[in-house]
Amino acid sequence: MIDRYKHQQLRIGSVSPQQISAWANKILPNGEIVGEVTKPYTFHYKTNKPEKDGLFCERIFGPIKSGICACGNYRVIGNEKEDPKFCEQCGVEFVDSRIRRYQMGYIKLACPVTHVWYLKRLPSYIASLLDKPLKELEGLVYCDFSFARPIAKKPTFLRLRGSFESEIQSRKYSIPLFFTTQDFDTFRNREISTGAGAIKEQLADPDLRIITDHSLVEWKELGEEGSADGNEWEDRKIGRRKDFLVRRMELAKHFIRTNVEPERMVLCLLPVLPPELRPIIQIDGGKPMSSDINELYRRVIYRNNTLTDPLTTSRSTPGESVMCQEKLVQEAVDTLLDNGIRGQPMRDGHNKVYKSFSDVIEGKEGRFRETLLGKRVDYSGRSVIVVGPSLSLHRCGLPREIAIELFQTFVIRGLIRQHVASNIGIAKSKIREKEPIVWEILQEVMQGHPVLLNRAPTLHRLGIQAFQPILVEGRAICLHPLVRKGFNADFDGDQMAVHVPLSLEAQAEARLLMFSHMNLLSPAIGDPISVPTQDMLIGLYILTIGNRRGICSNRYNPCNRRNYQNETVDYNKYTKEKEPYFCSSYDALGAYRQKRINLDSPLWLRWRLDQRVIASREVPIEVQYESLGTYHEIYGHYLIVRSVKKEILCIYIRTTVGHISFYREIEEAIQGFCRAYLYDT
């Protein structure tokens, strides 16, 4: 529906019988009104056409084929000059067949039926509004007992029985004869009330405002009694009663605010869903497969017609038989709306539980959550996230299997433009065969197209961010660990969805506002949100720990160098290993990749003279002289090579490969920041 402010919204609630009939009724040119489903049939077994006035009737729900009636006549849809709009023979309207997705019908119930959601769901709305026990109302609804209506100056049951005794002297046969006459129906309807009709009468009588006022007065009185009496049992009883009164007042105010009549909780007309929402399809071998709701509708129509026959005919029917049939109609409608709510669910011939209307709409796979609220969208995928430590902050790794599906239309367009494929079919076959040209075009497409990553629940705007995708091996999405906190995700099996923005506006928004390197601060408090996590800090610690004892320890001892404190060393096989010297960090990293040194192995790295590492008052630990007159001054963490004239020739610092890697990463990050700053200014 659309309100006065033109906001589209969906409201779920009870509907009046007039509204139900307005949804379904159509007036034919001959004045006949169609919309009521009276027959429990679906398709004719010979012609395979919908039965007239059945659950798939074309007069009620529209044609199966657009513009073709049940007779086979054809009219152009949308041509107003074509007259008439309905077929004169079969009464089918010449419209699009998509009308069968929303055109409804209805079943006119022979007796009122209580809506089981309002009766059996806890808390029971009917029990709350009438202030009666639920078991008492259930006994009344299912005709287990009845109550007498207030009468005034009308013949009672005893007086009527006396009139029969005057005609038939034998009291033994007078009462049974009275219960089998047609006059008993009039008497029962006037003085005895049972079934859902009795509930409807009680819901129509009270004034909602009076209910609200009386409940408020009682709630205040109970509050005073609870404060005066100190009995714990009585206090609990009063507390439960006060909670019930609050629910009753809220329910009455809701009916007043929404202008809904409480008697609508009792059904007189049962809506019939459009046929496309409860289809009958043919599987392999021509065997039909029907929705469970069709079988439940047929059950309702069968029992309703069985009850309608004795009520419309002139012959007399025992009252107990009528009450029993009303109970069967009530149970059939209950099964249609919510199978199993009253105990054992109804099953088919294969002992499979029928799927009722409640089962269709509720739950994760229901109509609302699957197709309306959380429905799946095109150009999207989902997979587990893992750490991508080599990724940049604004990049994410997409598996090839996901990427080729997300960007398949773009790849097809690229194959056709490069004349690799002449049509869409050939392009799809090349994609299925995974030819090398496909991955090349995919790389080109992904370079200029950002993707959106989302982790549910999206509680703030950082729950969905944009990234530049790159192809990775495997089946998991790779993510930089620093963006984890914004998504509130963990790398322990969490899943994230990936979406492709299609329009230029969406792509511009993703690049300008949603990229991860542009969302470094929390939108709530302004604190940095991309901060190192504990595992990152531990990794940096292991990377830079090196030899904590420094040069004063036995630097040639392998157990000190590798920090294996619990490892036993065989001193008989001990050999003195000299710490290597490297002219540049590239040489040191190359030696590490060749596995000539370890990550924490101490080494000497040549340092530039313009970067000072010399402490003015530091005394060398050791001085080593060479034959040519040069000498080495060894300090705690560096070494100076001097000439004969005491000039500094070069400087070496004592470090590890881990320190070198960490230093280079920081240096590159600072240089990149400076370049970006200069570019912006």
Swiss-Prot record:
Keywords: Chloroplast, DNA-directed RNA polymerase, Magnesium, Metal-binding, Nucleotidyltransferase, Plastid, Transcription, Transferase, Zinc
Single Gene Ontology BP annotation: DNA-templated transcription
Coiled coil: none
GO molecular function, one term: DNA-directed RNA polymerase activity
Signal peptide: none
One Pfam family cited in the UniProt record for this chain: RNA_pol_Rpb1_2
Named cofactor requirement(s): Mg(2+); Zn(2+)
Cofactor note: Binds 1 Mg(2+) ion per subunit.
Binding site for Mg(2+): D490, D492, D494
Matches recorded under InterPro entries: DNA-dir_RpoC_beta_prime, RNA_pol_asu, RNA_pol_N, RNA_pol_Rpb1_1, RNA_pol_Rpb1_3_sf, RNA_pol_Rpb1_clamp_domain, RNApol_RpoC1
Highest taxon of the lineage: Eukaryota
Positions contributing to Zn(2+) binding: C69, C71, C87, C90
The enzyme's E.C. designation: 2.7.7.6
Catalysis performed (reactions): RNA(n) + a ribonucleoside 5'-triphosphate = RNA(n+1) + diphosphate
Subcellular location: Plastid, Chloroplast
GO CC annotations, alphabetized: chloroplast; DNA-directed RNA polymerase complex; mitochondrion
Family membership noted in the UniProt record: Belongs to the RNA polymerase beta' chain family. RpoC1 subfamily.
Subunit-structure text: In plastids the minimal PEP RNA polymerase catalytic core is composed of four subunits: alpha, beta, beta', and beta''. When a (nuclear-encoded) sigma factor is associated with the core the holoenzyme is formed, which can initiate transcription.
Summary of the function given for this chain in its UniProt record: DNA-dependent RNA polymerase catalyzes the transcription of DNA into RNA using the four ribonucleoside triphosphates as substrates.
Name used for this protein in its record: DNA-directed RNA polymerase subunit beta'
Organism: Liriodendron tulipifera (Tuliptree)
Gene name as annotated: rpoC1
